[in-house]
């Protein structure tokens, strides 16, 4: 219903866009008369008009006309009216729903050119590195011709290369790269280390894939956590001895396991414990569950493979081996234990954001896709994006045949091979979509037996994929591809002219970026030849019936099925599609497979006879709708919980930014000092009369914070009335704040004597950054732990989300208070020296004395900064202190960063891709439950904190 309501205004929007296209057409004649130099000069003219205050909306028709003409001159491609309409829809911040083959990549040139004129940057987001590089080179030719800079962000780039790419007018890249750069910028220790320059306008290609499929998986930067891995091995030993349906049960549909009473007793017996579910043993339950899941739900060579002693995950939808990707929550370690390979460290979150919240940072967001219809409600609800269906340039004439359902998988594949062989014999190109590498290889063997020549796309190399897909429309071509392989590349009947021309030029050693002038000259020479060859072949293919798309299994999302179908019938070409299914397919097994099997058995049909029944088609559609709804709920839930973190993240990141941008922090440090002293005094004077206050304890606590210069007995004696009871809280607080300010001024003089003028400001910056980062990491850790168990609140009739919001807020406020206290303690007590003239390879560890840092703690946690236990000012005098040094070094603060791991969604959104970053030694293999690590982290934090005596109240 909501989808229908959202689509009510579509007709009006399309009419409005038609008017825009007509206006652009009216300007085209004048623009065509301009020389290349005059066309290029238009860019500067537009930039000046924008700088003078002209609105981009008013500039749209002229800018679109100029960009359209440039594309024609450079690429020999002129935007159709429907592409101009699509470009306008993108500029107005909508999702343009354009069918496959309608030229989405070329459409994006128009709004990206227009919005780049403001100088604030445009980000064009694609699904993989190959497409980002291809589009930046291919469409970049148009932008460069018009005098704009184009950059591309790829996964292996250095920070300097990234910074240069972001500084360009238009930047191409993948959603993961943009998101990780944002997180890394908010972990940077200086403004110079940051690479992004704001979030002005984003055009998301394949918007459904990025904003919907991938939105279930947050982007996470993590580092290794301490812990022991022997429990993984212990449970990997126990679980094979347990019997399914005796000791435990498995729900394949929900992918969960449940341990029976007999199973609990068996585990208790094996471990020699009395009660598995008592508090002390509760971490063992997650080890047991993970070991059972590893046994029952994760199959070798289907869900993962073992290569060179490493467990590598296979994406269930694309069939890709995802190098470096690891499951979270100890699941990967459980699989490693099952396969008896080295168990690698469990990771701790250092920074995280969901794609939903990352893309909501943009002032304006838009997107393109061929299949947004089924998700219009979600795009509107979460991103406030309207979906505008752009008419096709030519009417669609593809024939979508009804599904054929076979009893067994073997019978299904035999029928597929028969069909393919028949089509190949008459010269019709065939594209076969499979759901896994295993299936595509099985089908490939069957085709080889039948002597049908074919290409197999196992989706490992995007570049090769694109080349094969570009030729998949040639006469008699048979291509076996996993569902998502080769996305973003058009299958043109007779062969893709642009790709084949580009291929020939690259074979000659020409490149659009390295040798742009030679490439452009040769391009116009080669293009007509290739066009003629392809046109001749296209006629033969059309005669044979166009591209035949054959799906071997239904995907759990209707949208992915539609994408596969949409590869045929582009630009008014003839085409055909059909899905072959069997009762053994994943979707059938999960929903009503048993009912259908009973029906087929009753009908007593032979295995090789398919059924075409409306009931079956309805059942499949219903199953897909259920899965889509479940996934939408999952994404909404992820967003609701991340919304709590998002508010906190904004506060912390804004504070970090303020510190990094060089704001004078003296005032902030003073405010923190006053707040901390006030909190100490409030704690000591909260209850009772003045004579009940334990000032002795208060002074002991204050001495751990800063060198107190007054005695509480003197305060009482100097009181005018002379009675101890006459000392008020205000007088006490006032005296202590004045004393703390005196001590801080002295501290500043000492620091500047060691490290030169302005050293205190630098120390304030270093200390605040270090403490904010560490406290934020600890807070993320605590929030992860809170979220893990919050679902149980529902049993007490409480809304888990409300509880999470309330407790998360309390924890955040507590963290901010602890942050102030720790920062003040550091500013007074951290050991400072002038930085050496020559940078040392490795900083020397300070000697383990009471007045120095706890070296053991610093070694354990490379990012933790310890404090001295005594309240004295620990400044180390150096012989060369008289000589002014360029900077200071605070021991325990400028620590080595741990190796980082990046986790994010893969192209289909279900997978989590990780890659280890540089920055420090590789951590020793470690595991341990989150609870154990949390306790260890707490003890560590306590060890690092200056001793603080208990205060009353």
Curated annotation (Swiss-Prot):
Ranges annotated as biased composition (Low complexity): 854-867
Biased composition annotated in UniProt, kind: Basic and acidic residues: 929-947
Family label: Belongs to the SecA family.
GO molecular function: ATP binding; protein-exporting ATPase activity
Functional note: Part of the Sec protein translocase complex. Interacts with the SecYEG preprotein conducting channel. Has a central role in coupling the hydrolysis of ATP to the transfer of proteins into and across the cell membrane, serving as an ATP-driven molecular motor driving the stepwise translocation of polypeptide chains across the membrane.
EC number from the UniProt entry: 7.4.2.8
CDD domains on file: DEXDc_SecA (cd17928), SF2_C_secA (cd18803)
Name the record gives this protein: Protein translocase subunit SecA 1
Catalysed reaction, written as an equation: ATP + H2O + cellular proteinSide 1 = ADP + phosphate + cellular proteinSide 2
Swiss-Prot/TrEMBL keywords: ATP-binding, Cell membrane, Cytoplasm, Membrane, Nucleotide-binding, Protein transport, Translocase, Translocation, Transport
Binding site for ATP: 83, 101-105, 490
Deletion consequences: Essential, it cannot be disrupted.
Compartments reported by the entry: Cell membrane; Cytoplasm
Assembly: Monomer and homodimer. Part of the essential Sec protein translocation apparatus which comprises SecA, SecYEG and auxiliary proteins SecDF. Other proteins may also be involved.
A GO BP entry: protein import
EC top class named in words: translocase
